[in-house]
Amino acid sequence: MAANKNKNQSSLVLHKVIMVGSGGVGKSALTLQFMYDEFVEDYEPTKADSYRKKVVLDGEEVQIDILDTAGQEDYAAIRDNYFRSGEGFLLVFSITEHESFTATAEFREQILRVKAEEDKIPLLIVGNKSDLEDRRQVPMDEARGKAEEWGVQYVETSAKTRANVDKVFFDLMREIRTKKMSENKDKNGKKSGKSKKGFKQRCCLL
């Protein structure tokens, strides 16, 4: 029975999501809220924690693999390896800390550098701690302007109230899925082109 269960899980499509952002912005809190419906306020700084969950995305059962990375500068070197394995990124900052918003540009540059060979990288900007509106330091218009400049979606979340938590993970998975479908289509197109070319050559030889 267990073997069948593992077999079924391994056959599911897997979407790999990387949590990126400065320390203390709530990356771990968002991840744990999505995974377990729990709000964890006091959390030890993360080096890298990995989570996997089976979800239903637009009627299809899939698996999401979430890697929660460290925001501290000490871990900048090892982040490259994590970024290489990722298929999509949630770039998180706290609306109560403008410095964390400014830092998103540097994190994005690191992602683009590591993923230089890829055309469009699935990425969302996430303004967390929307429940602390009275302490807001990042105007919504400023964050939206940055998202528009980068050609990505901007969503505000609260790991505490669970506002938009599911939305950011599911929206990112949809972007990852679209990219995979596009890449598969391109690959199949190239294979088809090669087959036709080979067929023509054989015809000429005959």
Swiss-Prot record:
Location(s), subcellular: Cell membrane; Midbody
Biased composition (Basic and acidic residues): 180-189
Alphabetized Gene3D superfamilies for the sequence: P-loop containing nucleotide triphosphate hydrolases (3.40.50.300)
Gene Ontology CC, one term: plasma membrane
Keyword annotations of the record: Cell membrane, GTP-binding, Hydrolase, Lipoprotein, Membrane, Methylation, Nucleotide-binding, Prenylation
Substrates-to-products reaction catalysed: GTP + H2O = GDP + phosphate + H(+)
CDD domains xref list: RalA_RalB
Main location: membrane
EC number: 3.6.5.2
Compositional bias of kind Basic residues: 190-200
Segments of this protein annotated with the region Disordered: 180-206
Family: Belongs to the small GTPase superfamily. Ras family.
Function: Multifunctional GTPase involved in a variety of cellular processes including gene expression, cell migration, cell proliferation, oncogenic transformation and membrane trafficking. Accomplishes its multiple functions by interacting with distinct downstream effectors. Acts as a GTP sensor for GTP-dependent exocytosis of dense core vesicles. Required both to stabilize the assembly of the exocyst complex and to localize functional exocyst complexes to the leading edge of migrating cells. Required for suppression of apoptosis.
Name used for this protein in its record: Ras-related protein ralB-A
